[in-house]
Swiss-Prot record:
Listed InterPro entries: ADP-Glc_PPase (IPR011831), ADP_Glu_pyroP_CS (IPR005836), GlgC_bac (IPR023049), GlmU/GlgC-like_hexapep (IPR056818), NTP_transferase_dom (IPR005835), Nucleotide-diphossugar_trans (IPR029044), Trimer_LpxA-like_sf (IPR011004)
GO biological process: glycogen biosynthetic process
Subunit structure: Homotetramer.
One GO MF term attached to the UniProt entry: glucose-1-phosphate adenylyltransferase activity
Stretches of the chain forming a coiled coil according to its record: none
Alphabetized CDD domains for the sequence: ADP_Glucose_PP, LbH_G1P_AT_C
Protein's recorded name: Glucose-1-phosphate adenylyltransferase
Associated pathway: Glycan biosynthesis; glycogen biosynthesis
Alphabetized PANTHER family for the sequence: GLUCOSE-1-PHOSPHATE ADENYLYLTRANSFERASE (PTHR43523:SF2), GLUCOSE-1-PHOSPHATE ADENYLYLTRANSFERASE-RELATED (PTHR43523)
Length: 405
């Protein structure tokens, strides 16, 4: 077993996720159900725990009740050892205010760092879908001798303008960090690719503290990790890019190696689900060497198919009953019922949904506890759908939580 340095992991989970509305109308973005049996935050927490980092503070703020409950129930590391995954709301330790940016969230939580006295601090986002061994990034960070490391994923330059982009020299030292540039910088070894920031960072502890305290003094700062703190280290030639493609996750395949998705929009959220349901999926949830952990479905019996109910090229979670209906190219979360003659195709169905007899659901996302009445149709007539629901640019119909159609 490898020896790990003294590390505190901080997960930024206070995001509102406006672009995922209505899925984020009643919950924080990291609490949005994903992949049938998980929530978005389960991916980063699984990566940290699988790597052996067991002191994790999850900083929460926006509509965090379901997220807090999930962390306490699904991620309870109780026992005699000093390990924990703790949900930490805004403490107002530096004034009567809530978190004002991601850097301010960590600033207000400096007591956690002072108490733990780690040598290094990992700061990861909570709402991306991927597998990664963070210990490999920490090892490379230590080897560089620099104060800050930023995980970068290689994306085509033609698509990189949507991201924070990294320009680095041949040694991996970051020379420029720019948000959503019109002309993204190339990687040192490929003129057609750009390093896009994944929002995952490793810091030498005292250097991070100094940067946060300096940023606090700047009244013009947005107090943002990517917009302010990382440029602070870049200006001092103390930032290193960690190439995500160099990360070797046990059990990964050539097809899903390096998979990472920002699911911040309805279309990207939908597409990430479709990535999982092929025979040879782009993202493989069935890698037992690096599992994605969750216990949301622990109290449900196995899925059941009766009266010629079928599911093809789909993932169906425990507790589902497909009774005479047909499910194709879809992801069904726990406790979904599909009645006789109903068709669900190319859709993402969140927990507790009821789909009535003869109903049709196509190219849609149904949030928790939606009831689709007998014979109702969703995703067939776009004009009609736009009158009733949100329809994304890509044509995905989204029905909000607890709605009856």
């Amino acid at each position: 077993m490898r020896s790990l340095p003294n590390v505190l992991a901080i997960v930024l989970a206070g995001g509102e996720g406006k672009r995922l509305f209505p899925l984020t109308e009643d919950r924080a973005k990291p609490a949005v159900p994903f992949g049938g049996s998980y929530r978005l935050i389960d991916f980063v927490l699984s990566n940290l725990v699988n790597a052996g980092f067991l002191k994790i503070a999850v900083l929460t703020q926006y509509k965090s009740h379901s997220l807090d409950r999930h962390i306490s129930q699904a991620w309870n590391l109780s026992g005699p050892t000093p390990q924990y995954i703790a949900s930490v709301p805004a403490q107002q330790r530096r004034g009567k205010r809530w978190y004002n940016g991601s850097a301010d969230a960590i600033l207000q939580s400096l007591n956690l760092i002072y108490d733990e006295k780690p040598d290094y601090v990992i700061v990861f986002g909570a709402d991306h879908v991927y597998r990664m061994d963070p210990a490999q990034m920490v090892e490379e960070h230590i080897a560089t001798g620099l104060d800050c490391s930023v995980a970068g994923i290689r994306v085509p330059r033609s698509e990189a303008s949507a991201f924070g982009c990294i320009q680095a020299d041949g040694m991996g030292t970051i020379t420029e960090f720019v948000e959503k540039p019109e002309n993204p910088p190339a990687t040192p070894d490929d003129p057609n690719m750009t390093y896009a920031s994944m929002g995952n960072y490793v810091f030498t502890t005292q250097a991070l503290i100094d940067a946060l305290l300096e940023d606090e003094k700047n009244e013009d700062s947005a107090h943002d990790m990517g917009g302010n703190i990382i440029p602070y280290f870049v200006e001092r030639e103390q930032a290193h890019v960690y190439d995500f493609m160099a990360n070797e996750v046990p059990g990964s395949t050539e097809r899903d190696h390096g998979y990472w998705r920002d699911v911040g929009t309805i279309d990207s959220f939908y597409e990430a689900h479709m990535d999982m349901i092929s025979v040879h999926p782009i993202f493989n949830l069935y890698n037992r060497s690096w599992p994605i952990h969750s216990t949301d479905d622990s109290n449900f019996p196995p899925a059941k198919f009766v009266q010629n109910g079928i599911a093809q090229s789909s993932m169906v979670a425990p507790g589902c009953i497909v009774s005479g209906g047909t499910v194709r190219n879809s992801v069904l979360a726990s406790d979904v019922h599909v009645a006789d003659g109903a068709t669900v195709e190319g859709s993402v169905i969140l927990p507790g949904v009821r789909i009535g007899r003869g109903a049709v659901v196509r190219h849609a996302i149904l949030d928790k506890n939606v009831v689709v009445s007998d014979g109702a149709i969703i995703g067939v007539d776009r004009e009609r759908d736009e009158e009733r629901f949100k329809v994304s640019e890509g044509g995905v119909v989204v029905v909000g939580k607890n709605v009856k159609v």
